[in-house]
Amino acid sequence: MKIFTQKVKKLIERKDFQVLTKLLSENPNLANKGITIPFDFFCRQKKHPLHRICDAIFARKISDDDGIIFAKIFLENGAKIDGNKINGGGTPILAAASLHAEKLGIFYIESGADIHYTYQDNGETALHWASFCGRDKLVDRLIRSGAEIDGQDKTYNSTPLGWAIHSLQSNDTVNKF
């Protein structure tokens, strides 16, 4: 099985959508099998493929648009939109929000991601992270989708607005900030 999970990572790195589609259709269990970060030779920690797509976008190795294509392939072949949530792990929407994968985060919401989930019950939601990272389009979509705007995290006892005010460091010209 390890050879297949390494192959999934390599197919993401090569942006080989067709071969990945074929591999996952023949081995659908791989759609939820953890992989290390694409393009990173030192990473040893495995996470859900929908999470790792966000890592590749953050590293600017793939575009948001390519990330959406990859996510569609994984989802069409049985990937769980909430990744390893059932095991207490982070979810792909949390990864997208915290790793500046704005378009992909919106796609995850449209695909049914749990926008209310907090990692390890610490109160930090996708809205907290999108606010901190200055992702106004993702913040807007989360709010329009019913995300709790007054929820406080347990570490800083702060709302998403508090996180946004704290960071105010986004130099991203695509965002309104």
Sequence positions of predicted segments:
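Ankyrin repeat domain, specifically the short helix-to-loop turn at the C-terminus of the second helix
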Residues: 24-30, 70-80, 106-114, 140-148
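Eukaryote-skewed repeat-based solenoidal scaffolds used as protein-protein interaction platforms
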Residues: 87, 94-100, 118, 124, ...
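Ankyrin-repeat and related helical/solenoid repeat scaffolds used for protein-protein interactions
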Residues: 137-140, 144, 149-177
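N-terminal segments that cap or nucleate solenoid repeat domains
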Residues: 1-49
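Start-of-repeat signature of ankyrin repeats
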Residues: 46, 88-89, 122-123, 156-157
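Ankyrin repeat boundary signal
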Residues: 32-34, 83-85, 115-119, 149-153
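Ankyrin repeat A-helix N-terminal signature
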Residues: 10-15, 44, 52-65, 95-101, ...
